[in-house]
């Protein structure tokens, strides 16, 4: 068997110190490469030495840009609203023509012109227009029926009868009542009581009422002679001129007479609807007349 030989370098003792240093330097070349002959300060400037790292850097995500294509890409843009905004009437006419052509069930008819409303010339015309009799519940009412064309009826839609039954009390009220709120003062019948009965009252101040603010001065009113002194005090307290007071008094008692003939009670809200003043002042008038018993049967 061959014995392994070990290479041993021995330095003689009689070698000088400089020789020993040179031998040690030569010995280092056996275990490491020789140093570069270029100085270290010049190596960085002349040679691009790659830096080593124990942790490899992660690759950066590269953004891939789409390559431009030579063929153009088709794009769709809506122009319906722009066309409608430029000419809405023409667009509507075209849509109607399309509906008439594809859907014959839809027919667009022009509305008939309304006849001008005839103004009442006298109290008899007003009374006749308000007391026009309606059809009975068993017979159709020709005055309130609305004609329908065949084009207005859509296929598949149920037909409903819009005629309603009417109670006997409502029928009697419609044939006898007068629209007090919309009737001129001169055409209203005067159902006001005789105010001379106020002189026989035991209390010194009949037709009492309260209102905020100072009373209205009616000393120079040209219609003050038509009012009782108690009525003058009531009108001044409510700050109503004499003519306004007379107008609302006649309307209140006309409405009271209409409801009494129908067998109905006369409430404060009924006086408010018939009057042409503030609802609070109408309530004060109703209370003043009610306290004196003018609404008693």
Curated annotation (Swiss-Prot):
Gene Ontology molecular-function annotations: chromatin binding; DNA binding; transcription coactivator activity
Any GO BP annotation: chromatin remodeling
Domain SWIRM, first and last residues per copy: 207-297
Keyword Isomerase (UniProt): no
Keyword Nucleus: yes
Renumbered residue ranges of the record's region Disordered: 50-70, 109-173
Broad class of the protein's primary localization: nucleus
Keywords of the record: Chromatin regulator, Nucleus, Repressor, Transcription, Transcription regulation
SUPFAM superfamilies: Homeodomain-like
Transmembrane segments: none
GO cellular component: nucleus; Rpd3L complex; Rpd3L-Expanded complex
Subunit structure: Component of the RPD3C(L) complex.
Function recorded in the entry: Component of the RPD3C(L) histone deacetylase complex (HDAC) responsible for the deacetylation of lysine residues on the N-terminal part of the core histones (H2A, H2B, H3 and H4). Histone deacetylation gives a tag for epigenetic repression and plays an important role in transcriptional regulation, cell cycle progression and developmental events.
Listed name of the protein: SWIRM domain-containing protein laf1
Protein species of origin: Schizosaccharomyces pombe (strain 972 / ATCC 24843) (Fission yeast)
């Amino acid at each position: 068997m061959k014995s392994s030989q070990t290479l041993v370098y021995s330095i003689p003792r009689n070698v000088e110190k400089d020789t020993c240093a040179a031998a040690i330097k030569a010995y280092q070349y056996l275990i490491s490469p020789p140093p570069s002959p270029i100085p270290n300060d010049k190596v960085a400037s002349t040679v691009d030495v790659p830096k080593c790292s124990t942790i490899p850097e992660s690759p950066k995500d590269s953004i891939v840009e789409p390559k431009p294509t030579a063929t153009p890409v088709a794009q769709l843009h809506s122009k319906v609203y722009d066309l409608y905004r430029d000419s809405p009437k023409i667009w509507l006419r075209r849509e109607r023509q399309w509906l008439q052509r594809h859907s014959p069930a839809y027919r667009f008819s022009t509305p008939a012109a309304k006849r001008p409303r005839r103004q009442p010339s006298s109290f008899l015309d007003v009374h006749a227009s308000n007391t026009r009799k309606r059809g009975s519940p068993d017979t159709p009412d020709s005055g309130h029926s609305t004609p329908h064309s065949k084009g207005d009826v859509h296929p598949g839609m149920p037909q409903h009868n819009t005629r309603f039954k009417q109670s006997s009390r409502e029928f009697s009220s419609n044939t006898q009542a007068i629209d007090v709120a919309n009737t001129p003062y001169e055409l209203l019948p005067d159902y006001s009581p005789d105010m001379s009965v106020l002189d026989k009252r035991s209390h010194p101040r009949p037709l009492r009422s309260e209102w905020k603010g100072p009373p209205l001065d009616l000393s120079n009113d040209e219609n003050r002679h038509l009012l009782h002194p108690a009525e003058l005090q009531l009108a001044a307290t409510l700050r109503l001129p004499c003519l306004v007071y007379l107008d609302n008094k006649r309307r209140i008692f006309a409405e009271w007479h209409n409801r009494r003939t129908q067998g109905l009670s006369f409430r404060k809200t009924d006086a408010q609807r018939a009057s042409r003043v503030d609802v609070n002042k109408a309530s004060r008038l109703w209370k003043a007349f009610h306290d004196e018993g003018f609404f008693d049967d």
